[in-house]
Amino acid sequence: MTKLIIHLVSDSSVQTAKYAANSALAQFTSVKPKLYHWPMIRNLELLNEVLSKIESKHGIVLYTIADQELRKALTKFCYELKIPCISVIGKIIKEMSVFSCIEIEKEQNYNYKFDKTYFDTLNAIDYAIRHDDGQMLNELSEADIILIGPSRTSKTPTSVFLAYNGLKAANIPYVYNCPSPDFIEKDIDQLVVGLVINPNRLIEIREARLNLLQINDNKSYTDFNIVQKECLEVRKICDQKNWPVIDVSTRSIEETAALIMRIYYNRKNKYNK
């Protein structure tokens, strides 16, 4: 496989550059990437430390830096080394400025903006934690999204990912031969999404979990027939209620959450017409 070094340089958390890099890397199956993360680069002293690392390990540079002086120093350095230096959002900012006829603000303010979006995200994270794994079912009316599925179908991390996008998500496990949650019998306004998975894949995940916890006496948890029935029952319930179902067998948490958000916002836009 072809090795590829990528330096992610940011005056913040490098997440934007990381998402861009991973999205691009998904198009190259024969590449073995090595990502170097350089967050919170906000002055020349810190940048010079990064530049020395880039010089010792040549690779593509992806950056999100607002300060003009730092950007110039970084791009000049990479130009002299003859390595690509790409602004992840520079083109977007420029096009926004041209289209809206609004001049780009030169001054960079590193104080975080504590706006409504920020507090909505905090509230959503708090909600996801308090309503994990079927807890506090009496507060489901506050949820934007409810996830239901067998154990180990990525319900919890998906709920947290949704929360980071400002959506309150509760998740409820479906266990074969156990009473179904009351909300299944009711007509509710919230978006309910069923998560299912290939039974063989689910058994692998559950066996790994049991090994990690050093538990050897839970045969039903990894019994193929029971696992298969749990997935089939979730599908059946969702079909009866006309709830969408997502098969997470080959999907990342980000993919699953993105699909759920698309369903949620399509539904919301439909009702807001």
From Swiss-Prot:
Catalytic activity: N(tele)-phospho-L-histidyl/L-threonyl-[pyruvate, phosphate dikinase] + ADP = N(tele)-phospho-L-histidyl/O-phospho-L-threonyl-[pyruvate, phosphate dikinase] + AMP + H(+); N(tele)-phospho-L-histidyl/O-phospho-L-threonyl-[pyruvate, phosphate dikinase] + phosphate + H(+) = N(tele)-phospho-L-histidyl/L-threonyl-[pyruvate, phosphate dikinase] + diphosphate
Enzyme Commission number(s) from the entry: 2.7.11.32, 2.7.4.27
Pfam families referenced in this protein's UniProt entry, alphabetically: Kinase-PPPase
Binding site for ADP: 149-156
Entry's Gene Ontology molecular function annotations: ADP binding; ATP binding; phosphotransferase activity, phosphate group as acceptor; protein serine/threonine kinase activity
Domain of life: Bacteria
Keywords per UniProt: Kinase, Nucleotide-binding, Serine/threonine-protein kinase, Transferase
InterPro entries linked to this entry: Kinase-pyrophosphorylase, PPDK_reg
EC supergroup of this enzyme: transferase
HAMAP family reported for this sequence: PDRP
Function: Bifunctional serine/threonine kinase and phosphorylase involved in the regulation of the pyruvate, phosphate dikinase (PPDK) by catalyzing its phosphorylation/dephosphorylation.
Protein family membership: Belongs to the pyruvate, phosphate/water dikinase regulatory protein family. PDRP subfamily.
PANTHER family linked to this entry: PYRUVATE, PHOSPHATE DIKINASE REGULATORY PROTEIN 1, CHLOROPLASTIC
Record's protein name: Putative pyruvate, phosphate dikinase regulatory protein
